[in-house]
């Protein structure tokens, strides 16, 4: 079993991911979605957490061997980023969604040197907007952002477009395609449910029709 399938299995087992194609969730954006993900839950399960953190380390070493600093997005990327930095004996920083409105007004907490090669950690990619904003903020502070590594992606076309336009490399440990395949194999969803989940990936507006 691939790392992506192993992680997908764990996400389903610990209920970090819920699939309800016949009774969809409503996202904050208003989109009706057959999937809901809360990867913060992974922190409460040592086996799952260890699988994910080791996967992050292996992936970063394979794709970004020149990395000099790990950064986590606030708040979901902070605990994972801190653990990864510890495992790799690298500096760690985190990036706020916006600068503080008091004190020094920092958006990046921690010390990042000019030109330092950075990998940003995120837990979930939907459209990628928030982590790309974080990458832009880090670049403005002088960091050399090598890329983003995340636990999971919905594989939405908008995310691919956004990362391409930003010129930022994205790698994820698991993805929507792997997860729904595992879900069908393990009996979490029916054939009809799988069909709806596949339609959602292609068209987030009209998938129920």
Curated annotation (Swiss-Prot):
GO MF annotation list: magnesium ion binding; orotate phosphoribosyltransferase activity
One Pfam assignment: Pribosyltran
Catalytic reaction equation(s): orotidine 5'-phosphate + diphosphate = orotate + 5-phospho-alpha-D-ribose 1-diphosphate
Residue positions binding 5-phospho-alpha-D-ribose 1-diphosphate: 96, 100, 102, 122-130
Listed EC numbers: 2.4.2.10
Record-listed orotate binding positions: 126
Keywords: Glycosyltransferase, Magnesium, Pyrimidine biosynthesis, Transferase
Assembly and oligomerization: Homodimer.
Protein name: Orotate phosphoribosyltransferase
Annotated source species: Streptococcus pyogenes serotype M28 (strain MGAS6180)
Recorded name of the encoding gene: pyrE
